[in-house]
């Protein structure tokens, strides 16, 4: 029997860059769905994209086969093309600059190593149902916080 694949649809966003930001995860396995979200009062879009993937993978209780589907090429390319070189060069880019968001990249690399992860990119705002849903989720989180909400992170089953 083939192993079931967990799907993590992730997105991060920011109003202003830097500015208020949020991340969201739509997790799906065998017909069950769960959402995770969080808010950060001062951040960047890229940090929220990375945080969404990190929190989604951290939510998995045991090593799993996972598809991480994101509209962030920064996330996908970082994990599939750039990470090994950054590590080899002491967290420097090919141009010699310090890698931005190194703190999250290091955490993400460590948690991803526990799983078999496929990193997939989808075009944002193109009608991809799950990407649109997770984008709407993180925008609701930013709206609620802007309206005086206090929760920084949350989750729920659908």
From Swiss-Prot:
GO biological process assignments: DNA replication, removal of RNA primer
Key words, A-Z: Cytoplasm, Endonuclease, Hydrolase, Magnesium, Metal-binding, Nuclease
Enzyme nomenclature, EC number: 3.1.26.4
Listed GO MF terms: magnesium ion binding; nucleic acid binding; RNA-DNA hybrid ribonuclease activity
Cofactor: Mg(2+)
Locations listed in the record: Cytoplasm
Quaternary data: Monomer.
HAMAP family (UniProt xref): RNase_H
Name under which the protein is recorded: Ribonuclease H
Biological source species: Acidithiobacillus ferrooxidans (strain ATCC 23270 / DSM 14882 / CIP 104768 / NCIMB 8455)
Gene: rnhA
